[in-house]
Amino acid sequence: MIRKATVMKVYKDKYDDYKQRHDKLWPEMAEMLKAHGVHHYSIFLLEETGQLFAYLLVEDEDSFSEVAKTEICQKWWAYMAPLMETNDDLSPVSHDLKEVFYLA
């Protein structure tokens, strides 16, 4: 498994909406992620700044790179766009983090 971590940003007045939408994650979104080899996906919020820290395990990069091309992912991005910083294609502005420590 490949460990991945990213940072995104949610608007400060949208924290509750962001959490509520993820609490009710569409079943088809969860199914698609699992079908593309995503496991143990967690998102944490730093309330002082609105930074979101996402951590997930993926089976392989090629399969994971296909997630963004799915129709359900595109719909999810549009649904979440009013709550967070996004790119022109409505994907979240996301910065991959470099792993500097790991204890197995």
From Swiss-Prot:
SUPFAM superfamilies: Dimeric alpha+beta barrel (SSF54909)
Catalytic activity reported: alpha-L-rhamnose = beta-L-rhamnose
UniProt main location, coarse: cytoplasm
Binding sites annotated in the UniProt record for substrate: Y18, Y41, W76, W77
Signal peptide: none
Gene Ontology BP terms: rhamnose catabolic process
Pfam entry (one): rhaM
Pathway annotation from the record: Carbohydrate metabolism; L-rhamnose metabolism
GO molecular function, one term: L-rhamnose mutarotase activity
Keywords: Carbohydrate metabolism, Cytoplasm, Isomerase, Rhamnose metabolism
GO (cellular component) term, any one: cytoplasm
NCBIfam families: YiiL_rotase (TIGR02625)
Known role: Involved in the anomeric conversion of L-rhamnose.
Subunit structure as annotated in this protein's UniProt entry: Homodimer.
Family to which the UniProt record says this protein belongs: Belongs to the rhamnose mutarotase family.
Protein name per UniProt: L-rhamnose mutarotase
Gene source species: Shouchella clausii (strain KSM-K16) (Alkalihalobacillus clausii)
